[in-house]
Amino acid sequence: MAQRSIVRTKAVVLRSIDYGETSQIVTLFTQEKGKLGVMAKGARRPKSSFGATLQPMAYTQVVFYHKPSRTLQTLSESSHVQSFHRLREKLPTITVGLRIVELVDALMEEEDPQPAAFALVVRALHRLNIAEARVSNLWPYVQLQLAQILGVAPAVDRTRVEAVTGDEGLLSLADGGVYPADGTPDQPKRASRAALRAYAVCARADLDTVMRLTMSPAVRREVEALVRDFLRYQFDDAYPDRSRSVIAQIEGAKPTDRAT
């Protein structure tokens, strides 16, 4: 018979839903166990010890009772490792943060530890919390880095990127590589030279370099479409779009925050 153990680990909250009168079911991405669901009993009571630690994007230290035969574990304790207060102050940072945790929730397998992916998510949320500009650059960067961790690294070659000398080139959805306009890659998608070069930076450069990258709104939209189409091709229906549609409704109802 499988024995119950007590697990203490760092975690990022991916999502939570109300359960019953006072509880919540919370999906965590943990450093030690990967993605898993926990029951937080009494989390919705006014004086709950969980406080705000179960909100999506929270970076926490959790203690839970783990039994391998269960699909839902029992959460005992949760406290902030780092409180990302500024992340929730502006729509652009909320947008990117929610997209990141939704993507992780969609692509991670249950109880499959992915320490590199966990470190990536924490690093991205930390940067969102402190960034003053170009926070949207994090979104294509995180997607392409996560694809690499999961075994579908974009085959971006510097020589081929530099060979794109005209106004347009090609992105291969099959391997994520950039090719000149006269190339013959599998599953080609035509794009502007500016977007392909920005895509290559997001795929190969370090985070500090990516955060210094300046893109026009048109190029940014094109880069995001390239990354989205590449991941959709690689992960099929697992690639999520729920937060995108919700955020579009929010942006349509509020003045645009230009500090992106």
Swiss-Prot record:
It comes from Salinibacter ruber (strain DSM 13855 / M31). The gene is recO. Involved in DNA repair and RecF pathway recombination. Keywords: DNA damage, DNA recombination, DNA repair. GO terms for biological process: DNA recombination; double-strand break repair. InterPro entries: ARFGAP/RecO (IPR037278), DNA_rep/recomb_RecO_N (IPR022572), NA-bd_OB-fold (IPR012340), RecO (IPR003717), RecO_C (IPR042242). This is DNA repair protein RecO. Belongs to the RecO family. It holds the Pfam family RecO_C.
